[in-house]
């Protein structure tokens, strides 16, 4: 897509949200009870994600990267601290309100695609739109267009078991982006792929989020892939440290 279209999309998002952070966390603490002891995984994490920004979070295994992503996405609640999504008090909302805002404003991609095996690629991608209440014809039309954008326009009737690993992850990316979310949270999205396929999938994610003006937070062990983002943050000892 052209630079002009990219700029138009980011301008649209900026007009909608202004200078408000798409996603912001302040003082996040997350503690778990383990072996009779409290283990603090997050110890006062602050993070701000701007419109269209691409941020990588790196760190050792077990450092709490996935936990942080789950808290940012409203899939887990912090022990203390708060998260704002599009300027709204995400953590203070009721579960129903959180679910509604999450479905509208966030997309998720995981290491394992979590596609529904009994549904076709088209039905998997259309699912978030159906949950949002869009009519069936429009949901399928939008899903078809998004699958075409990820290079799977001829594979829409295939079920996940009939697709390669890279193709399944492309379907997962299409599902994450089909509702034009403000931000995509990705947890090791290329961790289950070979190096060549991982590079292709990561490039696709970056290109789509650029052209759609979508913000992007990725947890990854791959420093080379992280280096393609605008910023790299390292989670160490429960705190985020900016590396670049």
Swiss-Prot record:
ATP binds at residues 59-66. Disulfide bonds: none annotated. InterPro entries: AAA+_ATPase (IPR003593), ABC_transporter-like_ATP-bd (IPR003439), ABC_transporter-like_CS (IPR017871), ABC_transpr_LolD-like (IPR015854), LolD_lipo_ATP-bd (IPR011924), MacB-like_ATP-bd (IPR017911), P-loop_NTPase (IPR027417). Gene3D superfamilies: P-loop containing nucleotide triphosphate hydrolases. Keywords: ATP-binding, Cell inner membrane, Cell membrane, Membrane, Nucleotide-binding, Translocase, Transport. The keyword Cell inner membrane applies. Transmembrane segments: none annotated. Its EC number is 7.6.2.-. One of its GO terms (biological process) is protein localization to outer membrane. It is a peripheral membrane protein. The complex is composed of two ATP-binding proteins (LolD) and two transmembrane proteins (LolC and LolE). PANTHER family: IMPORT ATP-BINDING PROTEIN, LIPOPROTEIN-RELEASING SYSTEM ATP-BINDING PROTEIN LOLD. This is Lipoprotein-releasing system ATP-binding protein LolD. It comes from Ralstonia nicotianae (strain ATCC BAA-1114 / GMI1000).
């Amino acid at each position: 897509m052209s630079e002009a279209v990219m700029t138009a999309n980011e301008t649209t998002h900026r007009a909608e949200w202004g200078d408000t952070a798409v996603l912001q966390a302040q003082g996040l603490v997350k503690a778990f009870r383990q072996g009779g002891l409290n283990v603090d995984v997050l110890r006062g994490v602050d993070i701000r994600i701007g419109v269209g920004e691409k941020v990588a979070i790196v760190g050792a295994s077990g450092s709490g990267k996935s936990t942080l992503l789950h808290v940012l996405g409203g899939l887990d609640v912090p022990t203390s601290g708060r998260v704002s999504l599009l300027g709204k008090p995400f953590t203070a909302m009721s579960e129903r309100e959180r679910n509604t805002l999450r479905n509208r404003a966030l997309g998720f991609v995981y290491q394992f695609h979590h596609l529904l095996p009994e549904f076709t690629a088209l039905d998997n991608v259309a699912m978030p739109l159906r949950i949002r209440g869009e009519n069936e014809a429009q949901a399928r039309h939008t899903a078809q267009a998004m699958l075409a954008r990820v290079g799977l326009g001829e594979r829409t009737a295939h079920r996940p078991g009939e697709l390669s690993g890279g193709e399944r992850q492309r379907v997962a990316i299409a599902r994450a982006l089909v509702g034009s979310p403000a931000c995509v949270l990705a947890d090791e999205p290329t961790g289950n792929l070979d190096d060549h396929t991982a590079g292709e999938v990561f490039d696709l994610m970056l290109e789509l989020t650029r052209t759609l003006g979508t913000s992007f937070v990725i947890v990854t062990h791959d420093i080379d892939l992280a280096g393609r983002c605008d910023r790299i943050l390292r989670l160490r000892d429960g705190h985020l440290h900016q590396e670049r």
